[in-house]
Regions:
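N-terminal Rossmann-like or analogous alpha/beta NTP/dinucleotide-binding catalytic cores
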Residues: 2-12, 17-142, 294, 298
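Non-catalytic, well-ordered alpha-helical scaffold segments
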Residues: 95-99, 136-139, 162, 245-249, ...
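Short helix-capping/linker segments at secondary-structure and domain boundaries
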Residues: 107-111, 146-153, 256-264, 294
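Internal, conserved structured core segments that host functional sites
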Residues: 115-118, 123-172, 176
């Protein structure tokens, strides 16, 4: 089968289905994905198999959480007319390629992945001494290579995973692609990382319980902002503050317009405004951003079949591209499903 020609560079990225997404997910990835749709051929997936690498003991919420992520994908602006949006587990070719790549990937490569040691140290309440957890970077590589992605948008913490994918692609091509390389070596598209604090001032993360969710209604957003930590040096209302060391100031830099940002800078530094007023302006900016998303999200919440149909249509497109790649992989390895006469067979 001849692969479909690519007119634009192809991008692949995905998110684990941990439930509803938060502002950190939006700023760190989703916002950038939406912008990329007009420039690249985009494949975006909910990587539900990856959820099993750490949460294998309880899979009861994987499907529900996957739908929640899909709602947020669509509400934020991912367009099924511009991008292929799908569930990883519905494309079995990911698993087949993962199996084949695992045969050629040295254990040492996996053990040196920075996030492997970090997560083993940080997640103490789960047994992560499993083959699946050690090998999840190979599954991640299969996710990328199955679509012959040219580029992968990632944050700095994921650069090592893309580098591993390049090494695996290079090794596969070295073994089986002498006549013609099967896989391109994907390039990293580094996502600009804005500093987005949670309500306690640390990095916004579900594990810290400090998130503002994309689906949070306005009263919840305003309440969360009211409790958000501020410049520790500003003890009294009359004390001047510094928005450059204040988590609320960081929110303003990302979400507020220039006029509001100017008022925050002048008012905070001169003690002309209090933290309550400053937090109210930040809440205004978040509500303005999230209200349209939440209106779009409600359409899918009220009729989940709409989102499911989009995922199913995306799955068909993804399987077509993945199937073409697997034909190339099997052919290169001499394991084609089609009958091929032995090379030393005599002509009849």
């Amino acid at each position: 089968m001849t692969a479909s020609p690519k007119t634009r560079k192809r991008v692949l990225s995905g998110m684990r289905p941990t439930g509803k997404l938060h502002l950190g997910n939006y700023v760190g990835a989703l916002q950038n994905w939406v912008r990329m749709q007009d420039q690249y051929e985009c494949f975006f997936c909910v990587v539900d198999w990856h959820a099993l690498t750490t949460d294998y003991a309880d899979t009861s919420r994987v499907k529900e959480n996957s739908l929640e992520v899909a709602y947020d994908f669509l509400a934020a602006g991912l367009d099924p007319e511009k991008s292929v949006i799908f569930l990883q587990s519905h494309v079995p070719e990911h698993a087949e390629l993962h199996l084949l790549l695992s045969m050629i990937t040295p254990l040492g490569w996996l053990e040196r992945v920075p996030t492997y040691k970090e997560q083993r140290e940080n997640i103490k309440d789960k047994d992560l001494g499993t083959y699946g957890f050690l090998g999840y970077p190979v599954l991640q590589s299969a996710d990328i290579l199955i679509y012959k992605a040219d580029c992968v948008p990632v944050g700095e913490d994921q650069v090592a995973h893309v580098e591993l994918t390049r090494e695996i692609a290079r090794r596969f091509n070295g073994f089986y692609g002498a006549a013609k390389p099967v896989f391109p070596e994907p390039q990293t598209l580094l996502t600009p990382a804005a500093k987005l604090p949670g309500t306690d001032g640390r990095k916004m993360s579900k594990s810290y319980g400090n998130t503002i969710m994309l689906a949070d209604p306005e009263p919840v957003i305003r309440q969360k902002l009211k409790t958000m930590v501020t410049d520790p040096a500003r003890v009294r209302r009359t004390d001047p503050g510094n928005p450059d060391v204040c988590p609320v100031g960081d929110l303003h830099k990302i979400f507020s317009d220039k006029q509001t940002m100017a008022k925050v800078n002048e008012g905070c530094r001169s003690a002309g405004i209090g933290c309550i007023e400053c937090k109210g302006w930040a809440a205004d900016a978040l509500v303005k951003l999230l209200n349209p998303m939440q209106e779009r999200r409600r359409k899918f919440e009220e009729n989940p079949r709409l989102a499911w149909d989009i995922l199913e249509a995306g799955t068909q497109k993804a399987r077509k591209a993945a199937g073409e790649t697997m034909n190339d992989v099997r052919s290169a390895m001499g394991m084609s499903l089609a009958y091929e006469a032995p090379k030393n067979a005599e002509s009849q």
